[in-house]
């Protein structure tokens, strides 16, 4: 038989595990939207730009639009579309925002549309997280503390790269 002390230790440990998994789950539910897999790419060398990535699922009955993204660590924060033309990667600001259809998912990931942080106002090299504000047409705004991660992009590193 287990004593009350053993039972309380088990319950306490179980609660701690649940709370820990919540904080590292990288999933946030917000007004019918599920935000997951969010991260900021670690800055390489003396680069003054970086990218942000997120998966947004719209569980609502109506379409939603991600209008804009804001940060306090870059002078410009934009939603970008990326296309390859004649072996050259071309990125363009998506001024009208991005539509997230009802019951569908938006993936802002490496090698596709993404968030661009341009002209960084502080070094992110020794920082583990940064707050980023997402502005939606219907749901309003939410601030997410996004981890800064050294992930390798899947894109071909030999491709040329230019903005606009």
Regions found by a protein language model. Give the residues of each.
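Bacterial N-terminal signal peptides that target proteins for export
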Residues: 2-11
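N-terminal signal peptide c-region/cleavage motif recognized by signal peptidases
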Residues: 20-22
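Compact, glycine-rich, soluble single-domain proteins
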Residues: 26-164
């Amino acid at each position: 038989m287990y004593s009350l002390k053993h039972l309380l230790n088990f319950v306490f440990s179980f609660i701690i595990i649940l709370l820990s998994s919540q904080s590292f789950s990288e999933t946030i539910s917000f007004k019918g939207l599920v935000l997951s897999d969010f991260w900021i790419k670690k800055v390489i060398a003396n680069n003054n730009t970086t990218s942000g990535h997120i998966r947004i699922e719209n569980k609502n009955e109506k379409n939603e639009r991600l209008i804009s993204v804001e940060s306090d660590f870059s002078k410009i924060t934009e939603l970008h579309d990326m296309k390859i033309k004649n072996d050259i990667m071309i990125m363009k600001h998506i001024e009208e925002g991005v539509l997230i259809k009802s019951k569908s998912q938006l993936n802002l990931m490496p090698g596709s549309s993404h968030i661009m942080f341009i002209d960084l106002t502080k070094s992110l090299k020794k920082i583990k997280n940064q707050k980023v504000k997402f502005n939606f047409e219907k749901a309003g705004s939410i601030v997410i503390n996004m981890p800064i991660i050294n992930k390798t992009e899947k894109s071909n590193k030999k491709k040329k790269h230019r903005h606009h």
